[in-house]
Amino acid sequence: MMKQFLPQGVCLRCQGCCRFKEQNSAWLPCLMDEEIQELLDRKIPPALISMERKIQPYSNPAGEGFICAFFDIKDNKCKIYDWRPFECQLYPFLINLRDRKIILTVDLNCPYVKDNLQSKEFKEYADYLISFLNSPVQIKLLKDNPQLLKAYEDISEAVELKIFDETK
């Protein structure tokens, strides 16, 4: 498991993550085969996993949009936090595919990122994450799971941290 940038308590107070405007949002986490298997092994109903290998959201009972199937809206907590998918662990950082290059971006809609973007902590974590994602194990993981490489074209508020060649 990778180190986290956001303290869990800070993240859970935001109420921005795990919610989606559309049922088929590009922001829905994609799942790797081993993550799907772990969910099934933990007796998660297969109906919560879409045919596109994404977590199937449900209509937000408190308003507009959709909620991650594993998000407890009453407690504002992830039910599977300790074994959440890779993309959930990575957020607010995103692996973005542009012009056949893999770009590590960060979502500036995250208030913690906005507040800490210029901090030493942010720079150190970005360096750690770049090194982590460029390790042979992670490069193989990305090559074996192309569904994790998304074209987040609608992200206007993202900072490109580093481009690493997908052919490594």
Model-based region annotation:
Residues 1-168:
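Short loop/turn segments that flank or connect secondary-structure elements
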